[in-house]
Amino acid sequence: MTQDLADMLTRTARLIAGDGHAAGLKPVQWQALRYLAAANRFSRTPGALAAWLGQTKGTVSQTVAALERKGLVARTGDAGDRRLVRLALTPHGEALLASAPDTIAEAMLAPMAPADRAALEALLARMLGGFLAARGHRPFGLCANCRHFRRDAEGGNPHRCALLGVPLDESDSRAICIEQEAA
């Protein structure tokens, strides 16, 4: 890889990471909010957030505490496992994300032709996936694209996670999951 390419990737990542500054958030706080909005109910935990961000649990704990103080995130205990902490966006956190202008990434991608965007997405997915796999990190991914996803498996809930043995609704299937394994 050339140094120019590495520099462009780094600069692009830094510009995109700065999205939350207008809302008074540090880049990691903005990324945490965006993750919690995109993650399924099983993946909204401090441990999953740490894995997604590539940070230590201690660092993520400080990030979550700051977001709690700002009224953007709430912690709750899990009814089935009292050792487990669940994270959720508060209505204020949801409103902040909903009112955010187009992201820097969206502005960068907007002038690109659809074929170029698709090619870039495929290359970045391969690059990121290879990097994560080589280091033993979880890849995350959409629930509906997982090998454990069973479409139309339940009467009241249309789908099922065969790994966790739980019913899934449509919102679960469109969210990212820490347990996701490519189908």
What is each of the regions a protein language model found here?
Residues 1-23:
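N-terminal leader segment of winged-helix/HTH proteins
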Residues 66-118:
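Charged, amphipathic alpha-helical coiled-coil/dimerization segments
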Residues 17-56:
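N-terminal helix-turn-helix DNA-binding core of bacterial DNA-binding proteins
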Residues 99-147:
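Terminal interaction helix/tail motif
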Residues 132-183:
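Mid-protein regulatory/catalytic core that forms ligand/cofactor-binding pockets
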Residues 15-26, 107-115:
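Short amphipathic alpha-helical boundary/capping segments
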Residues 26-27, 63, 71:
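Short alpha-helical DNA-recognition segment
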